[in-house]
A protein has these predicted regions:
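Conserved ABC ATPase signature
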Residues: 140-144, 148
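A short, surface-exposed alpha-helical micro-motif characterized by mixed small hydrophobic
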Residues: 206-208
Length: 260
């Protein structure tokens, strides 16, 4: 996937807000990359554009050579299922009237055009892979923990057999134990060849999972590169400021660089 000089503007005239400004990036097959920045930096808007959910005001997204947005449609040549997204609030993205099994089975039927029994069997397999057993699979979203809801959301996304998964702040609304489970799950998906774009303000999560990182401020990429290089030798003051907020040696080193 290539993001080429993408900008996104909301509104017009004097009230126009440019949320994303001339951003470019490349995502390789089977690669984990991170987009990091504070709230309001534009990272979630860019993720929605990459997922085909928000058209850019300028620039283009290319997936396997095709322009994702063409006219009023997104993802030409049957590539719609290949890029999926999970959101920060799993409760808001799940139908409150459906239990986990039904929610995932519904997605399986949409993407695979199979019968009810086959869809439920596939859904059970996906949920079990996510660490959701049959008893929990029969619970509705309000009966599940935040971490369980997020894993049901991931199972729904995987029902399309995607090659790219965009995850927008997937760990921000869950506890530390659930975060660890979800990150372990993502590592397994990477081992299976899935490409992951992790959007987060949590630098620890970004460092744990990604190989390359893009640092975003006010809609602009201010720094990018190999994750370890950016974290250990940041060049931009904004990146240093973000890193300085981390407890421990990495944050201490970043704070020292800010004082220079």
């Amino acid at each position: 996937m290539e993001v080429e000089n993408v900008s996104v503007t909301f509104g017009s005239g004097a009230t126009a807000v440019e949320a994303v400004k001339n951003c470019s990036l490349t995502l390789h097959e089977g690669e984990p990359i991170g987009i990091v920045g504070e709230s309001g930096s534009g990272k979630s808007t860019l993720a929605r554009v990459m997922a085909g959910l928000q058209p850019p005001s300028a620039g283009q997204i290319r997936f396997r050579g095709d322009n994702v947005f063409k006219g009023n449609k997104s993802f030409q040549s049957g590539n719609r299922n290949q890029v999926q997204m999970v959101f920060q609030d799993p409760y808001g993205s799940l139908n409150p009237q459906l239990n986990g099994l039904s929610a995932v089975a519904e997605a399986v039927r949409i993407h695979s055009k199979v019968g009810k029994d086959e869809a439920e069997q596939k859904a059970l397999e996906l949920l079990e892979r996510m660490g959701i057993g049959k008893l929990d699979a029969l619970k509705k979203p309000r009966q599940l923990s935040g971490g369980q809801r997020q894993r049901v959301s991931v199972a729904r996304a995987l029902s399309a057999s995607p090659t790219v998964l965009l995850a927008d702040e997937p760990t921000s609304a869950i506890d530390q134990s659930a975060q660890a489970q979800l990150l372990k799950l993502f590592l397994g998906l990477l081992n299976d060849g899935l490409s992951i774009v992790l959007v987060s303000h949590d630098l620890g999560v970004i460092r744990y999972l990604t190989k390359r990182v893009y640092v975003m401020k006010d809609g602009v990429f201010v720094e990018s590169g190999d994750t370890e290089t950016v974290f250990n030798d940041p060049q931009e003051d904004y990146t240093k400021m973000l890193l300085a907020s981390i407890p421990g040696e990495l944050g201490k080193a970043a704070r020292a660089k800010l004082k220079r």
